From Swiss-Prot:
It holds the Pfam family NTP_transferase. The gene is Eif2b3. The modification Phosphoserine is found at S260. Activated by the chemical integrated stress response (ISR) inhibitor ISRIB which stimulates guanine nucleotide exchange factor activity for both phosphorylated and unphosphorylated eIF2. This is Translation initiation factor eIF2B subunit gamma. Component of the translation initiation factor 2B (eIF2B) complex which is a heterodecamer of two sets of five different subunits: alpha, beta, gamma, delta and epsilon. Subunits alpha, beta and delta comprise a regulatory subcomplex and subunits epsilon and gamma comprise a catalytic subcomplex. Within the complex, the hexameric regulatory complex resides at the center, with the two heterodimeric catalytic subcomplexes bound on opposite sides.
Length: 452
């Protein structure tokens, strides 16, 4: 077994709490499938037979009840009261980890050729290989956000070599001063560094086993994304003398605080790179000289996805966009599944757009039009209803003559006759009165947070 796959499904979706207050983030429906289905399906498509899923008890119950995949999940629950980051979660399952690991977030939806990342990891004997994509901004409005001050996303500064594959620098702008400081040892080997600020971390990482060993002893690191990866990137091209000094101090360090141990303390001597002459020539051709590979034991690489679908569903806007994009992806991933479930009862199928999904046991009345939308299971949509660019979750009722545009309607909500809803988020179990006109509102229960 070359890799053990781990899916992180712990985060509560702090940036989309109006949705996740009633539905755990890994179970949010995207294209009528739970969000966590997408990384699990990605693993299954490339031949993984087992996966470790780190999650909560609520998600575990749902997965055990509804899991219909060939992939065998080993579900590990974290304590309910625990506030665990991704690095903490890896430590929690450390006894199960025997090989290099492939870590994915539960909110990743992508059609990436996974071998592109894995091949980098193998070819360069990397400590880390990760997936990034070019940032994409949706032009569609986000439900309930008109007039609100848009949160300014802090950018990552990413530096790569001339091949675009070796990851030489990575830092969030919040952690930077007015100047970028680059280590001289990096500039000696890579005098030209290409910087980009429009890349987004997809939360897909290949990690050497010794990196996980290092994490186990360095409990101050809580996040893979914001702490471990910048640390590994900084540790590249450490001079031989500094490595030797580290080795000389290793015994003393062990006697003191284990958390202070350097990554080089965990790299096995028998893990040093040994390549056949052909491989050495091949790597030299790829502009990573044999000398560089053999001397620099910590190596970080990145595959930057330029085409295809790659989205992390971390905000309400990205959640809406994922539901708009996913019908095309599902037609490839699940060609045997109909866009309209066979059990759905549709009065006028020609009024259902080819870019829409209709779930099981849903009823759609006479002269009702559904375009560019995802409709869940057991919904009731009466006559002369218009639904455009929307997501309706399960068991939603829309009465006669209503119009809904650009909105999310959560489970068991009711929209009474003649209502007009535009760019709204309607929470679980909410009722919109007849002939109401609602625009750019967030309508949730008193027990649900009002933050998006």
């Amino acid at each position: 077994m070359e890799f053990q796959a781990v899916v992180m499904a712990v985060g509560g979706g702090s940036r989309m709490t109006d949705l996740t207050s009633s539905i755990p983030k890994p179970l949010l429906p995207v294209g009528n499938k739970p969000l966590i289905w997408y990384p699990l399906n990605l693993l299954e498509r490339v031949g993984f037979e087992e996966v470790i899923v780190v999650t909560t008890k609520d998600v575990q119950k749902a997965l055990c009840a509804e899991f219909k995949m060939k992939l065998k999940p080993d579900i590990v629950c974290i304590p309910d009261e625990a506030d665990m980051g991704t690095a903490d979660s890896l430590r929690h399952i450390y006894p199960k980890l025997k090989t290099d690991v492939l870590v994915l977030g539960c909110d990743l939806i992508t059609d990436v050729a996974l071998h592109e990342v894995v091949d980098l990891f193998r070819a360069y004997d990397a400590s880390l290989a990760m997936l990034m994509r070019k940032g994409q901004e949706s032009t569609e409005p986000v439900p309930g956000q008109k007039g609100k001050k848009k949160t300014v996303e802090q950018r990552d500064f990413i530096g790569v070599d001339s091949t675009g594959k070796r990851l030489l620098f990575m830092a969030n702008e919040a952690d930077l001063d007015e100047e970028l400081v680059i280590k001289g040892s990096i500039l000696q080997k890579h005098p030209r560094i290409h910087f980009q600020t429009g890349l987004v971390d997809a939360h897909l990482y290949c990690l050497k086993k010794y990196v996980v060993d290092f994490l186990m002893e360095n409990k101050s690191i809580t996040s893979i994304r914001s702490e471990l990866i910048p640390y590994l990137v900084r540790k590249q091209f450490s001079s031989a003398s500094s490595q030797q000094r580290q080795e000389d101090k290793e015994e003393d360090l062990k006697k003191k605080e284990p958390k202070s141990l350097d990554i080089y303390s965990f790299i096995k001597k028998d893990n040093t790179l040994t390549l056949a002459p052909y491989d050495a020539c091949w790597n030299a051709f790829r502009r990573d000289k044999w000398e560089d590979l053999s001397r620099s034991q910590v190596r970080c690489y990145v595959h930057i996805m330029k085409e295809g679908l790659c989205s992390r569903v971390s905000t309400l806007g990205l959640y809406m966009e994922a539901n708009r994009q996913v019908p095309k992806l599902l037609s490839v991933l699940c060609p045997e599944e109909s866009m309209i479930h066979p059990s759905a009862q549709i009065a006028n199928k020609h009024l259902i757009g080819a870019d829409s999904l209709i779930g099981s046991d849903t009823q759609v009345g006479e002269k009702s039009s559904i375009k560019r939308s995802v409709i869940g299971s057991s919904c009731v949509i009466r006559d002369r209803v218009t639904v455009t660019n929307c997501l309706l979750m399960n068991s939603v009722t829309v009465e006669e003559g209503s119009s809904i545009h650009g909105s999310v309607i959560c489970n068991n909500a009711v929209v009474e006759a003649g209502a007009e809803i535009r760019d709204c988020l309607i929470g679980s179990g909410q009722r919109i009165e007849a002939k109401a006109k609602r625009m750019n509102e967030v309508i949730v229960g008193n027990d649900q947070l009002m933050e998006i």
